[in-house]
Amino acid sequence: MLIIRKAKIQDARLLSQLLETSYRFYFSDLWNNKDELKTYISEESSIENIVASLETPDHHWFIAESHQDINVAATGHDIIPGNIIGFSKIVLNQLIPDKDFTGIYLHKLYLTPHLTGKKYGDQLFDHIVAFGQERGQKWLWLEVLEKNPKAIRFYARKGMEWQKDIIFSSETQQSTMHIMAKNLSLIKME
């Protein structure tokens, strides 16, 4: 069982390391231009941006930890403490594109590299659902890369349904993103 805790300002450096390491591991092959990748990661993982987000009332970051150290050699990432499994970022009350209702926007859900397939993602996702329901959120939605079939299958298995496609554009490429959503008001709270 994971320990899932709400991140604090003091966690900004850890979140920055987790974000940079995880994003590079999972998505660097999808970028045509490595300079654009570097710029994107630099902006997303900047400690200043993370602190600003942590200080924003509707933004919530969660860190998933194990009771014991995971073998660091297995992950290959010695800059991340051995008990860290992953993290997520959500934003409450976000308008779903082309809809007239709001919900939790699941902005990030990343596991430390090489720790997928162990049901950690399920626990973190379920925590987000419960957190949203406790705060009266009726919907959960996210954007997922079309070229990330593993994540799409995971979210579909968790009850997320395709809503529409949007385009993410950088200077040199475009990527299709699926918007997926789940009605939280149909789920009984435990």
Which residue stretches match the model-derived regions?
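Short alpha-helical segment within the catalytic ATP-binding CA
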Residues: 119, 123
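C-terminal "cap" of GNAT-fold acetyltransferases
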Residues: 138, 142-152, 156-158, 163-190
